[in-house]
A protein has these predicted regions:
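Core catalytic DNA strand-manipulation module of type IA topoisomerases
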Residues: 1-264
Length: 266
């Protein structure tokens, strides 16, 4: 806590290079982060005089992303704060109301898992969600598929299992109630879906003796990410041209970025 309290952001500078191949433009950040502005400006000038960028390495790999676990109360509150700007108390109050309306399981849970016997009821709950407008199409697509069991663990279920929707479909809900219900229902669909499969390309470039890096990813199979269709936080989603080690690309531009160090929350 004291470290957080005494944390002072520090300025640093990074170079952002633009290059292109086959009319596909992309940007790459310098591997170096400069504590002082002048060395960064000096490097900027050297790069401006260069006309080409060399491709040093190109690495491609397939990345599998397992779906997130089901919500416990704390993770629901965090998500509702991030996505809906709801306070923790407001989220709990709405979840309590949904529970009293027999629409979701007991909200004051510290577990993100369900037991095997509850898992056996999940297919029936998913069939119910086929009638819910926002998720109907996705839920119907899960019919007959093997469900992901990452959130199923009898040993990790505490007094109450993770948050899931019940067999009762909502009739009328206020907007805030609907928002929380859809977070829980959507997470339930995500948790029991297939993994997301991506092709990730990492490229290292060199210009005037300075190294630059860029990542791009192409989703091969969206899996659980198709529920909300949201991009991953901080995801490198650059559209990259096909590059090979040793390629020489024309330099399109270079700029200096001023940034601040930030505190990492764990």
């Amino acid at each position: 806590f004291l470290e957080n309290k005494n944390f002072v952001p520090q300025k640093y500078w990074q170079l952002k290079l633009q290059a292109a191949k086959d009319n596909v433009f992309f940007a790459a950040l310098s591997a170096d982060k400069y504590d002082m502005q002048q060395p960064a400006i000096d490097m900027l000038q050297r790069i401006k005089e260069a006309e080409t960028v060399q491709v040093k390495t190109v690495e491609r790999k397939e990345v599998n992303q397992e779906p997130p676990l089901l919500y416990d109360l704390t993770t629901l509150q965090k998500e509702a704060n991030t996505k809906l700007n709801f306070s923790a108390d407001k989220t709990l109050s709405i979840a309590q109301k949904l529970y009293e309306g027999k629409l979701i399981s007991y909200p004051r849970t510290g577990s993100r898992y369900i037991s095997q016997d509850v898992f056996e009821e999940i297919p029936e709950r998913l069939v119910n969600l086929e009638q819910y407008t926002r998720f109907g199409g996705y839920a119907a697509g899960m019919k007959g598929k093997a469900l992901n069991s990452r959130s199923v663990n009898d040993g990790k279920v505490t007094d109450h299992h993770a948050l899931i929707v019940t067999e009762n479909l909502p009739d009328k809900m206020e907007a805030d109630e609907q928002a929380i219900y859809e977070l829980i229902a959507g997470r339930m669909l995500e948790a029991f879906s297939e993994k997301c499969v991506k092709d990730v390309t990492s490229v290292t470039l060199e210009c005037a003796g300075s190294l630059f890096t860029v990542k791009g990813s192409v989703i091969k199979s969206a899996g659980w990410r198709a529920v909300f269709g949201e991009k991953e936080d901080g995801e490198d989603n650059a559209t990259l041209p096909v590059m090979r080690d040793g390629d020489s690309l024309p330099l399109s531009g270079i700029e200096l970025l001023e940034k601040q160090t930030c505190l990492l929350y764990t």
